[in-house]
A protein has these predicted regions:
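Noncatalytic luminal/extracellular "stalk/propeptide" segments of secretory-pathway proteins
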Residues: 1-97, 185, 200-201
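Conserved structured core elements
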Residues: 114, 216, 220-223, 243-250
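An acidic- and aromatic-residue-enriched active-site/binding cleft used to recognize and process polar
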Residues: 10, 93, 133-134, 225-227
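A conserved hydrophobic secondary-structure block that centers on an alpha-helix together
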Residues: 64-138
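Active-site alpha-helical elements of protease catalytic centers
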Residues: 119-123, 239-253
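Alpha-helix capping and helix-loop boundary segments enriched in small/acidic/polar residues
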Residues: 104-108, 233-244
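Soluble metallo-hydrolase cores and metallopeptidase-like ectodomains found primarily
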Residues: 45-76, 80, 140-238, 254, ...
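Protein/peptide-recognition domains central to ubiquitin and immune signaling
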Residues: 1-40, 103-105, 117, 130-152, ...
Length: 260
């Protein structure tokens, strides 16, 4: 049997008018500070967060490393730094460089988008600049705006701080200690987004019942997705990711059906 069924994922539709700017302080007459804004083009500078809230925020930018709070691992990017009402700049993944399976398992939950975004919101951040490519499994936090940023934006934020991004991240990996700091920059994030908690998607399910009287009650699931990531910001070739996998899955299904 090959039934088609619907499901209801949550989604956010990004509308025209969304923007992201970095504001740089310039001191005039040794007394007055004015803020000069630099607007970054979509794709070259930023991408909207997949589950961003609708809204607009301007706030100081705090670099918060990997955005991880892991007391069980003795690591906290938010320790001794106030991000309430601020916009945090965070990395994807974690500072863990070990390939040991046990170590990877302990750090795993801190690699997830939802963990990082929820953690930033829990610390009172008003928004987030995410130095990582868009991906699934992000949570929706009402009133919390975020976007993904490229190296161009990150390097501009670090400029004039006495630090470089490359050396800062290298030291975190080397010492396994946070290096969070106030950057002295501000960011303006405007997301024109519509949240839809009841979007409709469709899947196709095919099932071949097993012949063993005992094992027929157990299942092996083979799956693939047809959707394509597009530009993130580099091109993901849709013919390969993930249509080649979808074609392989259909080939496996045909072979199994014929061998029954």
């Amino acid at each position: 049997m090959v039934p088609t069924y619907s499901y209801s994922p949550t989604c956010v539709e990004i509308q025209p008018g969304s923007t992201m700017d970095i504001l740089f302080p310039v001191t005039q007459d040794k007394k007055k500070t004015v803020w000069i804004s630099k607007t970054y083009p979509w794709a070259d500078g930023w991408f909207a967060g997949g589950m961003t809230s609708n809204g607009e925020v301007t706030a100081d930018v705090v670099y918060a490393g990997f955005g991880v709070t892991a007391p069980e691992l003795g690591y906290d990017d938010y320790k001794d730094i106030d991000v309430k009402g601020k916009i945090v700049l965070v990395e994807g993944e974690t500072p863990n460089i070990s390939r040991n399976p046990d170590s990877l398992a302990m750090w795993y939950k801190h690699t997830l988008h939802q963990t990082k975004l929820n953690n930033a919101a829990a610390h009172g951040a008003a928004g987030l600049l995410y130095k990582w490519v868009p991906g699934p499994n992000a949570p929706y936090n009402p009133g919390f705006v975020y976007c993904h940023v490229t190296d161009t934006v990150v390097n501009d934020i670090f400029r004039g701080t006495g630090k470089t991004y490359k050396e800062t991240i290298r030291q975190i990996y080397k010492t396994q200690k946070p290096a969070s700091f106030h950057t002295g920059k501000r960011a303006h994030i405007k997301m024109n987004a519509t949240y839809n908690p009841n979007a409709t998607g469709k899947n196709i399910l095919g099932m071949i019942k097993g012949s063993d009287p005992i094992l027929c009650n157990e299942y092996v699931i083979i799956s693939a997705h047809l959707d394509h990531l597009g530009m993130i910001p580099f091109l993901i070739e849709g013919a390969n990711d993930n249509n080649s996998s979808s074609a392989a899955m259909l080939g496996v299904a045909e072979a199994l059906a014929k061998s029954k």
